[in-house]
Amino acid sequence: MSSFPAFNHYALTVSDLQRSIEWYERLFESPPVAVMEEDSFRAAIWFEPMFAIHANRHQVEGDVFDESRIGLDHVAFGCASRTELESWPARLDALGIEHGEILDRSYGAGLAFRDQDNIQLEFFLPVGSSSEG
């Protein structure tokens, strides 16, 4: 194995599955392709790439995400162009989702925001990506 493996899927633990399904449906303008429940595990799944949110019946009450703890810092969704990245602030505004400004760094440009469980999300355009629409 000489190359870094591709990511297969992302799964985030949320406090309220139904509330999160509704939030991500509005964000992506797409319903999940599957909602499942098995024992204490409940999940909703979107494909391309595979993205899931899940809630366990035995969660810590009142817990919220904090990227300063060991574990996940944030999840970034890729943008194919600068035009696509620049379209997201208006979309987030229309949804009433607070966000920062697009930040240009040496490794790429990103727009950070948070879901209702305080999980930091980002739309990201790596350096070397298309700058055209």
What are these regions (language model features)?
Residues 59-65:
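Short beta-strand/turn micro-motifs at beta-sheet edges
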Residues 19-21, 82-87:
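Short, conserved charged micro-motifs
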Residues 1-21, 72-77, 129-133:
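N-terminal beta-strand motif that seeds the catalytic metal site of vicinal oxygen chelate
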